[in-house]
A protein has these predicted regions:
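Structural/interface elements that position substrates and couple domains in central-metabolism enzymes
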Residues: 1-206
Length: 206
């Protein structure tokens, strides 16, 4: 996979996904996908209700396309899933958004794709919960036809000092080759550098 020509799909355009999409889209062909039409309409007007991304950053994201249509994700090489994982009344994570995002990606991803998760999860979740959904809906085999990665989101909403580009970021992949691609990709937009974890589970525990 040639990193300079990679096509990205960012799933979820909240306070994590939008800044990520905006930074990547300065350099890469990027589709920002969200299921909320009103969110997409506001972003097309250059308005970010989370206030995490400035109008200048949105204007600079010259290769960013906003979409709520999964068909626009069919030619993507790398997906980055940034949907929320809220907790329920018993403080247990609600993985429903993660399951739905994995289903969306599984239905459109092509052989050779890499799916990176940033959503906050427990160690083991990516490979135990998300991978079977990706396999089910794609008909592809994990670590043969497609690969995964995990990079824990590190941004605190409203913190203008420790922003996406100047923090350091942990990365990981399901094979050494996938880990290399994921680490290289994030390294392009991060001034704070990256740290490659030994496995997805180690990155999830970080």
């Amino acid at each position: 996979m040639n990193i300079p020509e990679v096509k990205l799909g960012i799933i979820g355009l909240g306070y994590i996904g939008l800044p990520l999409a905006a930074k990547f889209a300065r350099r890469y062909d990027t589709v920002g996908f969200d299921v909320k039409p009103e969110r997409l309409e506001a972003l097309r007007r250059g308005e970010d209700a989370t206030l995490e991304t400035s109008s200048e950053d949105l204007k600079a994201a010259i290769r960013l396309k906003y979409s709520g249509d999964p068909a626009d994700l069919k030619d993507r090489d790398i997906f980055i899933v940034t949907v929320p994982t809220p907790v329920d009344q018993y403080n247990r994570p609600d993985l429903t958004p993660l399951y739905k995002a994995s289903e969306t990606v599984g239905k459109v991803m092509k052989p050779g794709a890499i799916v990176v998760y940033e959503s906050t999860v427990y160690p083991g979740c990516t490979e135990e919960e998300c991978v079977p959904i990706l396999e089910q809906f794609s008909g592809l085999k994990f670590n043969i036809d497609f690969f995964c990665g995990y990079s824990p989101e590190r941004v605190n909403p409203g913190d203008k000092e420790h922003t996406l580009t100047n923090i350091s970021k942990i990365t990981s992949g399901s094979t050494p080759e996938a880990a290399e691609v994921v680490d290289t990709l994030y390294g392009v937009i991060l001034k704070g550098g990256t740290y490659r974890a030994g496995s997805i589970k180690v990155a999830e525990a970080a």
